Amino acid sequence: MDMPTPSNRAGCNGNTGGTMGPSDDPYGAAAMNLDCYSEIYSPSVADQLFSLLNDPAAHRMFAMWPSMGSSPCAAGTSEDMPLDAYSGLGEAVEEPSQIMSVNPTEAEKTGKSSGELGSDDGAHQGSSMVPRSVVGSSLADRMLMALSLFRESLGSGALAQVWMPVEQEGHVVLSTCEQPFLLDQVLAGYREVSRHFVFSAKEEPGLQPGLPGRVFISGVPEWTSSVLYYNRPEYLRMEHALHHEIRGSLAMPIYDPSKDSCCAVFELVTRKEKPDFSAEMDNVCNALQAVNLKATKGSSNQKFYTENQKFAFTEILDVLRAICHAHMLPLALTWVPTSNGIDGGYVVGKDGASFSQSGKTIIRIHESACYVNDGKMQGFLQACARRHLEKGQGIAGRALKSNLPFFSPDIREYSIEDYPLAHHARKFSLHAAVAIRLRSTYTGNDDYILEFFLPVSCKGSGEQQMLLNNLSSTMQRICKSLRTVYEAEVDNVNAGTAAVFRKNNESCLPTGHTESSSHGDQSITGASFEDTSLANKPGVMEPELAEQVQPSSIGHAEKKRSTAEKNISLDVLRKYFSGSLKDAAKSLGVCPTTLKRICRHHGISRWPSRKINKVNRSLKKIQTVINSVHGVDRSLQYDPATGSLVPVVSLPEKLTFPSCDGLPTPSVGKTVEENSDLKSEEGCSLPDGSQRQSCQLQISDVKKSNEDEFHIGSGNSDFYGANATAKSNSEVTQGPLCPTGAFSALHLKGTDCTNPSSSLRPSSESTRNQIVGRNSPSIQQEDLDMLDNHEAEDKDHMHPSTSGMTDSSSGSASSHPTFKQNTRSALKDAASPALTVKATYNGDTVRFKFLPSMGWYHLLEEIAKRFKLPTGAYQLKYKDDEDEWVILANDSDLQECVDVLDSIGSRIVKLQVRDLPCIVSSSGSSTCLQLAAHSS
């Protein structure tokens, strides 16, 4: 770095980050009246410049670059004193009205205007205009030559100046005093104001770097269409800029190829608002390149992407497009750490290294994976493309650092140091934004930070939270290969361990968080982003989303599928057997349909936890029956270690049955609670055909020799009932479980029955009262149905020639009305929360509240009334927890539907109403429709 030697001289110096005051001058004591620019008197430099220009107007041009006339700062005069212009040889020339343009009269004499200078032939264009001896010239010489090349494209109402690092009072500061500059005369006052300012060149406490200091420290350009978008601490010359009507501002770092760090800062200010400074940045880069300088530290090597990376970017773009359309988001960006090796190629101001000058990881947007839903935000996208972020900057950098979704209700509140794009966000009126770090199963440990900007009109905290929840839900449905990153992966990377990342490794995903961040004097607390494991929870996509998500590369779908399936082995699947299929699919980064296909490939026909959940629901029913028997004081418990029901349930020492006519009045028992911590392999059918021991209930604690022992064996069906046998002579018979689970009362066979051909059972009246006294409506109906069937069988034995359905004297006909009455009253007595029913028939949908305790038939009546259909002339299907349509044909099915809703924490049931084929039969001259039976 060219660092002038400080010396004592009253002149251009000042305080860091403020206006300059009387102190030691950083330059030598030589008397210089061209803004103390001594090199201008060097014969070699003068010869180079005259040979460069080779024109009578050269004397005029020479007066345009060094500071003009006797410096007010050096001479002790005020800013309002007229400036005298000097040529390169120290001769005074008349000051034109605008320094940047040649007087028209003079242009006629010379035959050239400022726009024609150097445009006659190729020898006066581009880098050929600069002598080859610039390599040995000082930095100031080369900047002077670069300004001469840049002046043609500058236009009017602009000031270009260079900030150089100097030492002052033990600090390294940036100063433009005595440095080359270009200006329009109308901005001469602002030039003199700038000469009085110095800015810190290092991050030191208590020192404000200002715009030049920020660019010097970060090594990347910074620009704005209007300085009004800066806060006053971010642009320390704000009051002076407004006084001189400054609007546009551009600051670029200058690198010497022989040095690794920034050696100067180029600043350009204009009186016009400019949408961007792309053209000016390109012109500055070309001018610097001609004098062996550059405005970027890295190279312009084009990056190439693998096929898997292209797949990932394609899916990300599809996801962003769908979400922006579904939720009316104006913009969504994809940030990529450069360490991925997939940055977006060379852009001015982007250094090619993976780390910034401060040593932090940097992230850049990948433009092909960004989506602009509002055309007005295209300018913000271009601003992001010109500026990288460091890890921890902005919400995208914070999401990368914290590994959790990060939300800010107003990104404009950030300071420019915390969020280098804050002034652009203020320009485009962007408010809330959320960022989440994801990875793809196709690209291993490559990180992608998706940043979503909420609509400008979405400002309330409640409205923002609702939108975040909806956004999370949408991502769960449409993401395929994308998944969140679990902490173990980040810990391994931070610890420097060289562990190979497995694409489909199990992940411990966070469930939401509240993130707080302080920036400057502001403290922004991020609201919880509900269900942050959104990236791996795909499901059935809604029709409107399916239309929006149009994969750009359908031809690669098969390859994507095989890649995901190929990496999921049986050992990996076993680790997820204890949870639901959806949770496993989320953790593995595949959709449930794909996971089902993988299971079938490994010989697994049904997801194990589905069976376990059904067993648990059946155990509730069994427990109700067991508890209804007098003297049973233990509850069923499922032991996941053995796959059996291990707790022992004992009967009283003396359990006697008075006769075949009845049983003791039972007590209403409690249902066993569902075990949520079931292990993975228990109760599962494995591919090797080995069948693990299913649930068994062992009832022991034999006290006396005549005690009865109950065993509930295993069954292969999904529902289990109880069927225990006992004999009075202590001989115990073990019976299988009732495969349908419909009859849960205990049937005891004994030798003391009056009728040896019949089973020992209680009277119908006491048993019916016992059934009605229970809590579960579905169990009531099932048990009563079975009871009526057995009663009908008994009546058939007693009256073999009489039909129980037609002969009222047989007692069967009288029992049927009793069944209906008791069932309805029992169902009404059972208190249960109301369900929200959404029934669809021929494209029409109705919605209403329904109490499950009212029963299945009442549900039919409600639906028939709303669709004006004959009751029972249609079939119902409900959507279960595996997104499958299951027939709802009786109260047992209704209870199963309620259990499924409870397991997933929902109170909304979706029904499909379908017409049933009518069976036409005739009896005599009449014709009637025989509808499908709806009883249990």
From Swiss-Prot:
Positions of the UniProt region annotated as Disordered: 99-130, 666-697, 753-782, 794-827
Compositionally biased tracts (Polar residues): 688-697, 770-781, 816-825
Here the segments flagged for biased composition (Basic and acidic residues) are 671-682
Task: Identify the residues that the record assigns to the PB1 domain, covering every copy.
Answer: 834-916
Keyword DNA-binding included in the entry's annotation: yes
The domain of life for this entry's organism is: Eukaryota
Q: Name one GO cellular component term.
A: nucleus
Q: Where is the composition biased (Low complexity)?
A: 754-769, 801-815
What's in the keyword line of the UniProt record?
A: DNA-binding, Nucleus, Transcription, Transcription regulation
State the Pfam families in the record. GAF_NLP, PB1, RWP-RK
Cite the Gene3D superfamilies for this sequence. Answer: Phosphatidylinositol 3-kinase Catalytic Subunit, Chain A, domain 1
Enumerate the subcellular locations listed in this protein's record, separating them with semicolons: Nucleus
What range(s) does the RWP-RK domain occupy? 550-635
Q: Which InterPro entries match?
A: NLP, NLP1-9_GAF, PB1-like, PB1_dom, RWP-RK_dom
Which Gene Ontology terms cover its molecular function?
DNA binding; DNA-binding transcription factor activity
Q: Does the keyword Nucleus apply?
A: yes
Function of the molecule? Probable transcription factor.
Its recorded name reads Protein NLP2
Give the organism, scientific name.
Oryza sativa subsp. japonica (Rice)
Q: Which gene encodes it?
A: NLP2
